[in-house]
Amino acid sequence: MRFLGAALLLYFPASAEVIGFENAAPGKLPSGWTVAMTHDGAPPRWEIVRDLSAPSPPYVLAQVSRDSTAGRFPLAIWDATTIRDGEVSVAFKAVEGSVDQAAGIVWRYRDQNNYYIVRANALENNVVLYKVENGVRLTIAPKGLPSRSYGVNHAIPRRQWNTLRVAFNGGSFIVFFNGEQLFEASDRTFAEAGKTGLWTKADSLTYFDEFTVSGK
């Protein structure tokens, strides 16, 4: 398992595109991003907010609409890059949320109803990988666990900055939290290149910074 993970990581070039928000205008959606949403609920509102504790202060990107609809999944899609195989990471801080406190990374995004997503949840204290296919969110179990397994349990500290990362090559995925490899998984539903982006759920107020993309 460790050998496979190392081989997958070595496949990718060292250069990466790092998208920070330190120079963005507060209260607005930064350029280069498109807002979308899976399922129902109030429209997402992604905007720049101030956080001096951020990795690249003073500004971060947040989804600030607090609709508590449980099946509401706001998306912010980075339009500049389309990749099939590579890595995506983001720094995040789970700030508030009574229904959820979630932060997710999207890759091989086709549209708001078809993409892969891995998310960390500070209320459930777990990390789970899904595919959203035709609007239906389905769990992809970690390798070595039963097919209906729901990700892995792991402490997700609230109100402090953490890093979520996923590496993907073909149908193989590796998920990391704060630099620690958590699990591997596999799926071949979406094989073509797609966009990458950010994801939250329901009333999550989550801050994001240093969104990083590499691959081809």
PLM feature spans:
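Short, aromatic/His-centered strand-loop micro-motif at the edge of beta-sheets
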Residues: G135-R165
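Intrinsic-disorder/low-complexity, polar/charged segments enriched in Ser/Thr/Lys/Arg/Asp/Glu/Gln
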Residues: A16-G20, D85-S89, W161-T163
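Extracellular carbohydrate-recognition regions
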Residues: A16-H39, D209
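Secretory/extracellular carbohydrate-interaction modules
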Residues: P26, Q63-R137
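Short, solvent-exposed beta-strand-to-loop segments that form ligand-recognition rims
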Residues: G171-G197
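Ligand-recognition surfaces built from glycine- and aromatic
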Residues: I19-G20, F190-K216
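Sec-dependent N-terminal signal peptides
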Residues: F3-P13
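Extracellular glycan-recognition surfaces and repeat-rich motifs
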Residues: K28-A62, G71
